[in-house]
């Protein structure tokens, strides 16, 4: 592989891992990435047929997670930091997971945002253990888990409280 080809792959990894530079916003790069994800999901949802929203959320969540693992691994290795704070593609994946099956109203988008960020920051069992997995797997999976926790709570709220 040529040096310029590996450099362009590295640049791509940094671009995706930092969610197009959002990871460099301070303070709270993870919160910025999650907030932008909420806005992008809300915007994209107006272009997606409502009958396809569930599928779109699942596909987007899986795609971001599968792309996020190798790019996070690359950036962590190149930066010499196990879980760099500027890698925020994990927040994008977790936030998207939260919205699987959620209605598109500001109330549920805000609730999903707050739930996801809370679980991501607090890291209840076993999220801290997932974070210890090697490379991009650990970087991504604790946020995937936080997204799943937020998804479950949001769905419980929708089905039992918000009726």
Predicted regions: what they are:
Residues 2-35, 67-98, 118-148:
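Interhelical loop and helix-boundary elements at the membrane-water interface
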Residues 11-12, 50-56, 82-84, 104-107, ...:
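Membrane-helix interface segments
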Residues 25-44, 56-60, 64:
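Short Lys/Arg-rich amphipathic alpha-helical segments
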Residues 36-49, 96-102, 154:
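Interfacial segments of multi-pass membrane proteins
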Residues 44-59, 126-136:
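Membrane interface segments of multi-pass transport proteins and intramembrane proteases
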Residues 57-63, 109-118:
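Hydrophobic core segments of alpha-helical transmembrane domains in multi-pass membrane proteins
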Residues 155-163:
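Juxtamembrane boundary at the C-terminal end of a transmembrane helix
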């Amino acid at each position: 592989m040529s040096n310029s080809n590996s450099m362009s792959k590295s640049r791509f990894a940094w671009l995706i891992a930092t969610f197009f530079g959002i990871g460099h916003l301070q303070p709270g790069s993870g919160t910025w990435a999650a907030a932008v994800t909420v806005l992008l999901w809300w915007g994209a949802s107006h272009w997606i047929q409502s009958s396809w929203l569930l599928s779109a959320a699942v596909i987007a969540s899986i795609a971001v997670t599968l792309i996020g693992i190798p790019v996070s691994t690359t950036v962590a290795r190149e930066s010499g930091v196990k879980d760099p704070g500027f890698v925020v593609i994990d927040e994008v994946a977790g936030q998207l997971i939260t919205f699987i099956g959620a209605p598109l109203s500001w109330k549920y988008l805000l609730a999903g945002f707050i739930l996801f960020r809370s679980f991501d920051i607090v890291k209840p069992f076993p999220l801290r253990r997932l974070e210890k997995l090697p490379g991009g797997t650990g970087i991504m999976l604790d946020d995937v888990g936080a997204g799943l926790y937020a998804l479950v709570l949001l769905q419980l709220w929708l089905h039992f409280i918000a009726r």
